[in-house]
């Protein structure tokens, strides 16, 4: 049905956007290396922690998309996305604190901020994918459509 096709179009768009953000983050890593910029040990750990959270979200979203998980799984995805949002705000504050204490360069700070913002957007798109699948499936149930 048209609603299901529309949902799948949105899923494809969100997958493409995840790829765009991944490419942007990779470009930032190259730029960091070219500029000779390094992150503090704390910043590196924070990035690794946030990356792990986002990777878990992507994996769970894929499992939901493949329908390896039931609809109740969405609560877990919403909770994870809220934790990623909170983590981004927390890391932005840590970044500002390091800049204020001159523990990092403005270049490192800018790249750090851009990377964590990109990761947060990836988490948003991962949640969108599951949300569109849920709505598509619920529309199919309501209309009796076959997928």
Q: Model segments located where?
A:
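Cytosolic, long alpha-helical scaffolding segments
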Residues: 1-147
